[in-house]
Structure formats: C-alpha cells, structure tokens
Amino acid sequence: LFSEYDYCLNIGGFANVSFDNEQGKRIAYDLCPANYVLNRLMRTKGHDYDKDGETARSGQVNRELFDALNALEYYHREPPKSLAQEWVDRNVMPLVEACKDEFANVIATLTEHSAYQIARNFRPGARVLVTGGGAYNVYMLERAKAYADIEFIHPARNIIDFKEALIFAFLGLRRVLNQPNCLASVT
C-alpha cells in the first residue's frame, strides 16, 4: 500500500514512519511523541488540540527545553524502536513540567521538537505521505520542512482519518488469505 511515496508518516499520539530501505525491506518505527503530549497540554487550557498549530505559532521556542528533549537517549538509538505513554511520562513530562516558560512557548517548543525529529528521518527530496491528526497541524509541517527538503503529500481526508482502520482490514485480509501480515522490522 502507498508504495508511490518514499515514506509514509503518521502523526498521531506519536509520529511514526514506514518505508522500504535500500535492500527493499519494509522498516517502521516511532519517531517522537506528537499529539499525545500536545493534546494533553492543550486540554489543560480547555482545548482538545492545537488547531492548525496556532498556539505553537504564537509562541517562541525555548532553546533549553528543545535541546533537553532532543538529547533524550531514544533519539540516538537505531530502529526498530518504539515509544509508549510511559516513556513520555518518565522522560518528556518531567522536562516539560520543569520548564516555567509561558504556555504558548512550551507548545511551540514541543511542536518544534516533533518537527525536528520528523524531518531528520527523511532523505532530501523525499515524497512523504502524511496521515493522522497531525496532518492537519499546518505549523508543525511547515517547521519540519524548514529542517529538510521534503514534500508532504496529503491524501483524501478519509485516508488521513481512517488509515489505521484500513491497514487493520488489510492485515485481516492477508491473514484470511494465509499471507504474512506482520514483519519483524516493523514496531
């Protein structure tokens, strides 16, 4: 599925990527926390999410927090690798809670962090299919493009919103057909 793109990026609670490596092997792994942290913080202000990244756009990046987030050990490990809410609670939230900056600046910094971590995983000139709720975060995608020469392609809204359901149906079909439906190289 979606083989016409260099990478498939899903920006949900966590940003994750899948692609075929140089040997033609399918690789998939988590890049970084995304909407899980942003939405959690936005809810403290009565919003479900940062619509179009407007709150982030209104803030300034806190370099100390940005650098601390990017220094986390997970980002220096080779794939396959996977994230979980517990990892965020143990590693990210203490940094966020220790930052006494303005709310918009914290959101700007978390968005910048996600954008940076997303961008650093793509080769220059890549065509990237982007799905998940974060596909609607215009500002995050703008910031990712500032770090790398990448083209984000937005599919039809039903693909953005329901890709995971479609994938699980596809995996079920492969099972019914006695075809492999999981790969060791995918987390």
What is each of the regions a protein language model found here?
Residues G24-A115, R175-N181, T187:
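Conserved ATP-utilizing enzyme core subdomain
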Residues A15-D20, N39-R40:
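Short beta-strand scaffold segments in enzyme catalytic cores
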Residues L1-D6:
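Conserved phosphate-binding catalytic cores of ATP/NTP-utilizing and phosphoryl-transfer enzymes
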Residues A115-R123:
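A short, acidic, amphipathic alpha-helical segment used as a generic capping/interface helix at domain edges
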Residues A146-I167:
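Conserved phosphate-binding/catalytic loops in two-lobed NTP-binding clefts
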Residues A126-A144:
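Glycine-rich phosphate-binding loops at beta-strand->alpha-helix junctions
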Residues C8-N10, L31, T131, P155-F162:
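Active-site nucleophile and cofactor-binding loops and adjacent substrate-binding regions
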Residues G12-G13, W87-P94, Y139-D149:
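Acidic-glycine-rich active-site phosphate/pyrophosphate-binding loop
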